[in-house]
Amino acid sequence: MFTFFITTLIILASERTIQGEDLTNCEFTNTACAKLQQNFKGTYVQNLCTCDEGTTCSSSWSSDSDLQSITQGKDQYQFCYTIRTQKSKNCSSTEYAYKELTRTSIATNKKEISHNYYCYCPPESKYVYDKSEYSSTTHYEQNTRVFKCQTYPTCHEHEICQTAVERTDSYLVSKNCKCTGX
């Protein structure tokens, strides 16, 4: 018999959330402007960058027919533009699905983070870290983390299926493996 476990981690020190004027403009059409997550505490919205003229993208959960979002389980990524070509293409196990680019100004230490999607992970899959790439110029340091799709493994007996992180302003759940049975 398998048991369903959820571990909750409570973070007392709140991490600063980037909002409004601190957000950079979304650089590419495949850059996610927001990440939404549905869980039993509601829908959590993390704005990632702004669309044209500094407008934030949708903070509402979209239907599967929406061409400006990608749904991955209980997470949804919103985009400023139609992403039909990327959305309709499922990733193979060897393709890069997603890149997270962090560019840090050497002069000001200000970070710009962009989340770029290239294809869609199939249902019951997750984004898994594959590798990092680092480069620098006289003005910026740049770190790119690359992710691929991987099918969730089946949980073993007494293995933790999900991990929850609670902060003062958010509650996020990460699925670790596929639970079977009760």
From Swiss-Prot:
Gene Ontology MF terms: toxin activity
Localization of this protein: Secreted
Domain of life: Eukaryota
Keyword Secreted attached: yes
Post-translational modification: Contains 7 disulfide bonds.
Signal peptide location: 1-20
The entry's keywords: Disulfide bond, Secreted, Signal, Toxin
Gene Ontology annotations for the cellular component aspect, listed alphabetically: extracellular region
Tissue: Expressed by the venom gland.
Family designation: Belongs to the scoloptoxin-11 family.
Protein name (database record): U-scoloptoxin(11)-Sm2a
Organism annotation: Scolopendra morsitans
